[in-house]
């Protein structure tokens, strides 16, 4: 069986989410999450993420990918502060996810993916 070559995936951050991008850059944020849509289902352990916020870019390798059916199961494994440093509570984190247009429905349909970053 032929070994899969690691791939590169581009993840974009809106300018209003620059703080999140900065947390990743500084190493404070080690888990990035995305709704488990087809686009993100392709990301696997060993792949490289190019994280873009405006003209700023950085690369992180994916150490582990985990798919969760619900936010509740996500928070059983990862605390909200691991996903977004300083967010505080699970309730605040859920409110943040639901603030993104269409995200609540995407999570209900596709679940949510957690990418552990090196």
Which residues are covered by each model-predicted region?
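Short beta-strand-centered aromatic/proline hotspots
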Residues: 57-67
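A generic structural signal for residues embedded in beta-strands
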Residues: 32, 51-52
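Short, solvent-exposed beta-strand-terminating loops
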Residues: 68-75
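Contiguous surface segments at macromolecular interaction interfaces
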Residues: 75-118
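Catalytic phosphate/metal-binding cores of nucleic-acid and nucleotide-processing enzymes, i.e., regions
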Residues: 22, 35, 39-40, 59-61, ...
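Ordered hydrophobic segments in well-structured contexts
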Residues: 10-12, 59, 112-116
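Compositionally biased, charged N-terminal/linker segments
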Residues: 1-43
């Amino acid at each position: 069986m032929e070994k899969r070559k690691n791939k590169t995936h581009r993840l974009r951050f809106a300018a209003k989410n620059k703080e999140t991008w900065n947390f990743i850059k500084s190493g404070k944020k080690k888990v990035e999450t995305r709704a488990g849509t087809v686009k993100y289902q392709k990301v696997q352990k060993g792949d490289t993420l190019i994280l873009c916020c405006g003209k700023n870019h950085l690369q992180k390798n994916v150490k582990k990918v985990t798919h969760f059916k619900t936010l509740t199961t996500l928070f059983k494994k990862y605390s909200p502060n691991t996903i977004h440093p300083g967010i505080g509570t699970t309730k605040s984190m859920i409110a943040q996810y639901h603030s993104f247009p269409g995200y609540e429905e995407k999570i209900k349909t596709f679940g949510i993916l957690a990418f552990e970053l090196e």
